């Protein structure tokens, strides 16, 4: 059962935004897509402003939406790794286009890059 089963969408774009929207999901996807498989604490280090609770929730939602794969290894201490599914990998061209658009828009509106927090 998908997390989207009980929701209604007017168009496909609305569904896409429901899956990747929010403050943190695109950053999580970006790091997994650009840097490959990561453990929880590695993601937490890459996204320092995210709380542990929010990171857990966002990863669970992305897993439920079949965008992120969670691999649990039967070792002590527990080892869990996160990676993109093929469906998650298919989002990378979209995220790359959004990155390029944002970079161009930042120049257009003349945002001081030193003031803007670098999260990528």
Curated annotation (Swiss-Prot):
Q: Name one GO molecular function term.
A: DNA binding
Domain HTH hxlR-type: where?
A: 11-110
The keyword Nuclease is annotated on this UniProt entry: no
UniProtKB keywords: Activator, DNA-binding, Transcription, Transcription regulation
Tell me one Pfam family matched here.
HxlR
Asked if the keyword Transcription belongs to this entry, the reply reads: yes
Source species, domain of life: Bacteria
Describe the function of this protein: Positive regulator of hxlAB expression.
Q: What is this protein called?
A: HTH-type transcriptional activator HxlR
**What is the native source organism of this protein?**
Bacillus subtilis (strain 168)
């Amino acid at each position: 059962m998908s997390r989207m089963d009980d929701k209604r969408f007017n168009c496909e774009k609305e569904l896409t935004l429901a899956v990747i929207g929010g403050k943190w999901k695109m950053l999580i996807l970006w790091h997994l897509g650009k840097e490959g498989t990561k453990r929880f604490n590695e993601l937490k280090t890459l996204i320092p402003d995210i709380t542990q609770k929010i990171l857990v929730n966002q990863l669970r939602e992305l897993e439920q939406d079949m965008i992120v794969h969670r691999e649990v290894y039967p070792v002590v201490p527990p080892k869990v790794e996160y990676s993109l599914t093929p469906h998650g990998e298919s989002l990378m061209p979209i995220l790359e286009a959004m990155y390029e658009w944002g970079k161009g828009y930042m120049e257009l509106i003349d945002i001081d890059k030193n003031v803007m927090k670098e999260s990528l």
